[in-house]
Amino acid sequence: MYQGETLSLTRLDGDFLEINFNNQNGSVNKFDSQTLNELREAMVMLKQAESVKGLLLTSSKSVFVVGADITEFSVMFNATRDEFVAQAADVNRMFSDIEDLPYPTVAAINGFALGGGLEICLTCDKRVISSSASIGLPETSLGIMPGWGGTVRLPRLVGFNLALGWIVSGAPQSADKAMAAGAVDLIAEPNSLRKDALTVLADLAADSPEFLSQRTAKLGPVSITVQEASAAAEDACNAVRSRQGENYPAAFSVAELMVSACELTRDDAISLENHAFFDVTQTPQARALTGLFLGEQYVVKQAKVRNAPFAATSQPVACSAVIGAGIMGGGIAYQNALKGIPIVMKDINQAALDLGVSEASKLLDRGVKRGKLTEAKAEAVLSQISPSLDGDSITNCDMVVEAVVELESVKAQVLASVESQLSSINSVITSNTSTISINRLADSLQRPENFCGMHFFNPVHAMPLVEIIRGEHSSDQTIAAVCAYALRLGKKPIVVNDCPGFLVNRVLFAALLGMEMLIAEGADFEQIDQVMEKWGLPMGPAYLSDVIGLDTIVHCYSVLLKGLPERFIEIEPSRSSQVLFDGERLGQKNGLGYYRYSKNEQGRPSKTADTSVIETFENLFGKAKAFEEQEIVSRIMGAMGMEMVRCLEEGVVASPTEADMALIYGIGFPSFRGGICRWMDELGLSDACAMGDKYSSISPLYAPTEALRVKAAKGETLY
């Protein structure tokens, strides 16, 4: 009856019709403009068909439909209200046409039915789900809301409170949870999904009054009073505030919309949803979070693009090695073994090897306790790690990560030794360093083209970012191989060029220096932490310094003060971190830093104020005084932003997207802000330059570059 590139309409035996989603241009089905156009054309054919007893919706892909095509969101976000509402109303009209067909409809859900994929299923009279499938409306995690009837149909199906909870959280729901909620009507085994769905459709066709009576409930108001709905919405919003503050407004918009729509008919509620959907797309959070989603895809794509020229000749890593055990080495070994890569963990000290194995075992035990691994699987993973004191144990490894102590002389010696022990001249060697020049380390090697930096962030198992540091001699093939290796480890590789601090530490320490300058002017570091955590950082800069370790902080400053002396300048009379370090305060590692630490009931460090630190700072910097919140934000994020602009202009990082993703992956930069570059774009580059000029007399870190001023004058953005 109809055959498109993304879907087909077919007449089946027994006078049933089937719309089958099968995107020929991609690995998954999604509601991009082409699919929606083809669905519109198929609906014309469907309405003209005669002697039809029912409609079945299916998918030939491993998923049903994963939702709208986010790559098309920028066009949608730039539409006027009238244009946007007209587009949303058009799709909603098409979905409602399915719901209003004069015969029963059934959706057979496999894999994932997310966003618009679930919304079209909600139009059907019945939903049959594969036991391995999940459903969900994840739009709030993108800073938006369901826009094709999800806020209207789900509460009329499962009840207001449950629907609100699902939509606000954005979390996927398993087949069992969906069944218990009443969102689906039958769970089928994957191999019998279509057959079982057809049986349900045939039964409905034989009993017309049943499906017609169920439709009546879906077309009217929700079974709840406005007062009850308002109370439920308030509870849901308070729960969001307790977790995320006011930073994710989409959840609040959804709650307000669903309360307003609960007494309306379907069509009136959908009309209300169209306008609310437009409003939420105009927020900075929507732009940031959808940009984040696209940024994640871009980072992975860039890694694959780098590897493409070598795909025909390159082989995946068969055996890896980490040189240097302990906590970091054990974490790297664990990540390799977990992803199926055999790894040699080499050290010269048995105690360090024991600690590395213990770290890997601890992480595996945690996975077993959380139900993510079976005991047998954990044992199999651990068996992939080969601890060794023998240098010859790494001979046949094709990828080596050096992770010894952060001393240049030691690393250079170890790297030269490793290179001499490898049997293949094509083996790749990397250094897990956070501060040491890759170019200088390469001087110790005979084949520097096979060498680059591979900076893992701690803890390795939890932090997604790996900085791949390109040295002057690093070959494209080496960079491609290490990016591919990082992807196999489940990490997000971002390539940066060698410079002091590389990318993340360079811009992070600009922000930390911004904090230390404030403290030297009499600011209260506790107020700074409170303001920056309210702004969205996972922890304030003083607290973060304690977590990193003040010995590490002092070392990193020394690298940047030496490497970038024109902007990273000593603070008079002293940096607060140096004062604390000189007083043998190392942060969490010895319980004394900006804060004092003790173990809580869960055995984790808990911080409290330390009057001795406050007294020390008052004696050195004067009595603490309060600063305006906006000045604190501007002084800290402004320093980070201007340093990131310089990194972009110098080619340290290739694009604003990669720059922002590095901060989100590496330091937990608030996702709802989209990254430092997007934050500056939202601020406006003219205002960013004005902010920099305001504080440039305090430090050259704040001074805007000439290229940034030109962009600002032209009304351009970093993106």
Residue ranges and their predicted role:
Residues 1-58, 82, 93-96:
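Conserved CoA-thioester-binding segment of acyl-CoA-metabolizing enzymes
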Residues 2-3, 8-12, 22, 75-80, ...:
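N-terminal glycine-rich phosphate-binding loop for ADP-containing cofactors
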Residues 62-66, 114-115, 436-437:
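Short, active-site-adjacent cap segments at secondary-structure transitions
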Residues 70:
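Glycine-rich phosphate-binding loops of nucleotide-dependent enzymes
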Residues 107, 111-117:
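Gly/Ser-rich catalytic serine loop of serine hydrolases
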Residues 117-120, 124-126:
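Active-site-proximal alpha-helical scaffold in enzymes
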